[in-house]
Amino acid sequence: MTIYTIGHSNVETGKIIEVLRSYGIEAVLDVRSSPYSRHAPQFNREDFAEELALAGIDYIYGGNHLGGKPKDPSCYDENDEDRVLYEEVEKKDWYQRGIEGLLQLATEKWTAVMCAEEDPNHCHRHLLIAQTLLDRDIEVQHIRHKGGESWEEPARRTLEREAEQLGFGDEWT
């Protein structure tokens, strides 16, 4: 199984839909904690869901379970209230239910997890959700609509962890 991710940034909805179609995506799971944007209002929840429906793509909101800014105060650094502690989020039942829902959806339809940030390296799609999926041996492909894509594979993740444990660090992988 492969789960895709995409960040909408501030491009037009037509561009995102075109990219999603090119990957055969049938369902978008929106993992924004707040599915509204002043900078990209075309991606406000109801409007974007309608655009996707017209394109034959299902829209599912999952930010209440898989959002990057959880409501649970125990998920934040006590010394920096803006810093989310992803290792704490991962322990929460509501997060695990969200992951189970994502996996169920992905067994039924080609699925893309969507957030606002285009670069997955700066988004909880990579920093949290992809890491959980990799731990379950699920491949993750980050779609970069501004050019290219990047894969995260469970085998590579295992090698990176082993190299880190042996003290080799980033220079090895």
Where are these regions (language model features)?
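Residues lining hydrophobic/aromatic ligand-binding pockets adjacent to catalytic sites
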Residues: 1-173
